[in-house]
């Protein structure tokens, strides 16, 4: 880390010279942040090293804009040179490779979890149309109210309903009307006889003489 001592001194001079001119700019914040964390890493702070490696890609974006826009190209080139040196000394290449491997590993794990979740879902079994047509007809037994057990062979729902309606229609007992009419006729005959008897009782001897 002592290799970056010269870069720290250079950054201190840049900050001291331009702090009043660029203090409100966004890219200037990255310059001050880089200087502060470099000092912390030289003192042996490992967290500052990780923070610098995370900061460098964003700082690179802002420092390249200084060159692209033509505002401060010379200052932008100096800052990019410092970034490149810090990135190389602190192991930025290994850090980036580690991040990429972690991303790839997390993507693989996510795919495994998705496949496992799909396997746990019960989607049923696929039945082909030929298998349905090749199944044997179903035999059902129906017990009508007035007949004995009768077996019907069903090949389709429509034929089953048609056969059921026909069996129920044929098995139903005919309606007898004669019993009711006989009872009514007997009742009417008995009432007529009673009326005749009552009429005979009401006749006296004179009626019998004159007929």
Curated annotation (Swiss-Prot):
It is found in: Membrane; Nucleus, Nucleolus. The modification Phosphoserine is found at residue 156. The chain crosses the membrane at residues 73-93. GO terms for biological process: endonucleolytic cleavage in ITS1 to separate SSU-rRNA from 5.8S rRNA and LSU-rRNA from tricistronic rRNA transcript (SSU-rRNA, 5.8S rRNA, LSU-rRNA); maturation of 5.8S rRNA from tricistronic rRNA transcript (SSU-rRNA, 5.8S rRNA, LSU-rRNA); nuclear-transcribed mRNA catabolic process, RNase MRP-dependent; tRNA processing. It comes from the Eukaryota. Keywords: Membrane, Nucleus, Phosphoprotein, rRNA processing, Transmembrane, Transmembrane helix. Residues 181-201 have a biased composition (Basic residues). It is a single-pass membrane protein. GO terms for molecular function: rRNA primary transcript binding. Residues 178-211 are annotated as: Disordered. One of its GO terms (cellular component) is membrane. Component of RNase MRP complex which consists of an RNA moiety and at least 10 protein subunits. Functions as part of ribonuclease MRP (RNase MRP), which is involved in rRNA processing in mitochondria. This is Ribonuclease MRP protein subunit rmp1. It comes from Schizosaccharomyces pombe (strain 972 / ATCC 24843) (Fission yeast). The lineage of its organism: Eukaryota, Fungi, Dikarya, Ascomycota, Taphrinomycotina.
């Amino acid at each position: 880390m002592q290799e970056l001592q010269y870069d720290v001194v250079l950054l201190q001079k840049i900050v001291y010279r331009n702090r009043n001119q660029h203090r409100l700019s966004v890219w200037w914040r990255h310059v001050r942040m880089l200087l502060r964390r470099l000092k912390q890493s030289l003192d042996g702070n490992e967290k500052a090293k990780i923070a610098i490696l995370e900061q460098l890609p964003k700082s690179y974006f802002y420092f390249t804009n200084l060159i692209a826009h033509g505002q401060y190209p010379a200052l932008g080139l100096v800052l990019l040179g410092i970034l490149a040196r810090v990135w190389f000394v602190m192991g930025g290449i290994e850090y980036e490779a580690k991040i990429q491997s972690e991303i790839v590993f997390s993507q693989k794990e996510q795919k495994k979890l998705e496949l496992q979740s799909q396997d746990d879902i019960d989607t049923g079994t696929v039945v082909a149309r030929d298998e349905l047509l090749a199944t044997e007809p179903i035999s059902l037994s129906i017990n009508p109210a007035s007949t004995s057990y009768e077996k019907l062979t069903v090949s389709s729902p429509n034929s089953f309903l048609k056969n059921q309606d026909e069996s129920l229609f044929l098995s139903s007992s005919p309606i007898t009307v004669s019993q009711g009419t006989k009872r009514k006729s007997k009742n009417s005959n008995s009432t007529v006889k009673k009326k005749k008897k009552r009429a005979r009782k009401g006749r006296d001897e004179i009626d019998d003489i004159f007929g």
